[in-house]
């Protein structure tokens, strides 16, 4: 699994499952990413609030798709909505190493210990540890860290990995289909499987 430099870019992002899903189905129908980008600019296929927002969404969706082996497209199309949301989350983890580490350091550890919730104290420890490990994270403002945490919580909730309540959030161990498990292993993404299940 490739590790990218840490980035705080996710403060501008959403889970964008419906947009990701639409783009993947267009790929499955034979369109290229370049054609989808052009179509997005011309017709606002994601119903974005502005051309700038449409460009941001398309750029991020394309980046997530590019991060996965093309064989994920038929897997995505054949999966149920639960599986599709997991694949969207996996794409987020592949493109955002800081988010992957958040899941790996908090969700994986909690599940491995037999615990089924995490809270703000866990997030604070994560940021404290990362500030020691990375100058880039150390230079993030408190406001940026809070916005990143909000984004990460949204990703996990929208993917069905956690509940969405305020305060401590219950962790829901995902039921991952055998096809997705096999695909993750085949493409050296076992660390993501472990991060999401704790085993």
Segments (PLM) and residue ranges:
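Eukaryotic partner-binding/assembly regions in large regulatory complexes
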Residues: 1-86
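Leucine-rich, amphipathic alpha-helical/linker segments
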Residues: 9-10, 26, 92-93, 97-98, ...
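Helix-boundary capping/turn motifs
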Residues: 12-16, 31-32, 94-100, 126-130
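Positively charged, polyanion-binding regions of nucleic-acid-associated proteins
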Residues: 87-90, 94-116
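Short acidic, glycine/proline-enriched loop segments that cap or flank alpha-helices
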Residues: 111-118, 136-144
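DNA-recognition alpha helix
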Residues: 119-135
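Accessory, usually C-terminal, subdomains that scaffold auxiliary metal cofactors
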Residues: 138-199
């Amino acid at each position: 699994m490739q590790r990218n430099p840490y980035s705080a870019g996710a403060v501008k992002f959403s889970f964008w499952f419906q947009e990701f899903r639409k783009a993947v189905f267009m790929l499955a129908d034979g369109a290229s990413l370049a054609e989808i980008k052009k179509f997005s600019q011309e017709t606002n296929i994601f119903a974005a609030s502005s051309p700038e927002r449409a460009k941001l969404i398309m750029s991020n969706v394309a980046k997530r798709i590019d991060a996965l082996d093309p064989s994920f497209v038929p897997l995505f199309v054949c999966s149920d909505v639960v599986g599709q949301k997991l694949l969207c989350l996996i794409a987020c983890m592949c493109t955002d190493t800081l988010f992957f580490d958040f899941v790996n350091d908090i969700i994986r550890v909690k599940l491995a210990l037999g615990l089924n919730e995490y809270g703000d104290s866990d997030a604070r420890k994560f940021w404290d540890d990362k500030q020691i490990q990375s100058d880039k994270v150390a230079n993030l403002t408190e406001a940026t860290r809070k916005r990143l945490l909000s984004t990460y919580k949204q990703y996990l909730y929208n993917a069905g990995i956690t509940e969405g309540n305020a305060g401590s959030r219950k962790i829901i161990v995902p039921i991952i289909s055998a096809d997705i498990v096999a695909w993750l292993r085949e493409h050296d993404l076992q660390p993501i499987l472990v991060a999401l299940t704790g085993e």
